[in-house]
């Protein structure tokens, strides 16, 4: 039990650390996304510097990383706490990938995948919240921040287990922390909208 749990946590980190956005930038444009735009390897920076198609593929792959880490833990019949730790390991791998000098993405897509795997109605509700905000504002970071803030509330009101509620708070804080510079620009009114160049 302990060994299988530890192996799943390690696998979760390795899954999360797969640098999909970085590889898209290198292979398709010959650029290092860590040196472009926001410096993030996530789908939004791919959208701004590589293109819509690659950004969609990166988004789906990043969602898959988070979902797979959780679903593997579930498939082995491990308890809720191991499941959420596997998901957090994937988030940590995405944010701090060992292959890229610990500089990765902002955990939004991978976090979405994680919660689709843990409690898909909550994951879909967060996605709906994200889409509603982005349709009104056309600001990805604002949509991410609102969805992150809403996540623990949605998990709590859905009757999620104590492990699920706890990890929703932790994941929300991780996403907000990764968006701290975006929040500063949002407050200053300088955050770019979709289609505009700039940091995000």
From Swiss-Prot:
Purpose of the protein: Catalyzes the transfer of an acyl group from acyl-phosphate (acyl-PO(4)) to glycerol-3-phosphate (G3P) to form lysophosphatidic acid (LPA). This enzyme utilizes acyl-phosphate as fatty acyl donor, but not acyl-CoA or acyl-ACP.
> Where is this chain's protein located in or outside the cell?
Cell inner membrane
Disulfide bond in keyword set = no
The molecular function terms in GO held by this entry are:
acyl-phosphate glycerol-3-phosphate acyltransferase activity
Q: Enumerate the InterPro entries for this protein.
A: G3P_acylTferase_PlsY (IPR003811)
Transmembrane annotation, as ranges: 1-21, 53-73, 81-101, 114-134, 139-159
- Gene Ontology cellular component annotations, sorted alphabetically: plasma membrane
- Reactions accelerated catalytically: an acyl phosphate + sn-glycerol 3-phosphate = a 1-acyl-sn-glycero-3-phosphate + phosphate
Q: What is this protein called?
A: Glycerol-3-phosphate acyltransferase
**Under which pathway is this protein filed?**
Lipid metabolism; phospholipid metabolism
Look up and give the organism this protein is from: Synechococcus sp. (strain CC9902)
User: Hey, which family's this protein in?
Assistant: Belongs to the PlsY family.
How does the record describe its quaternary structure?
Probably interacts with PlsX.
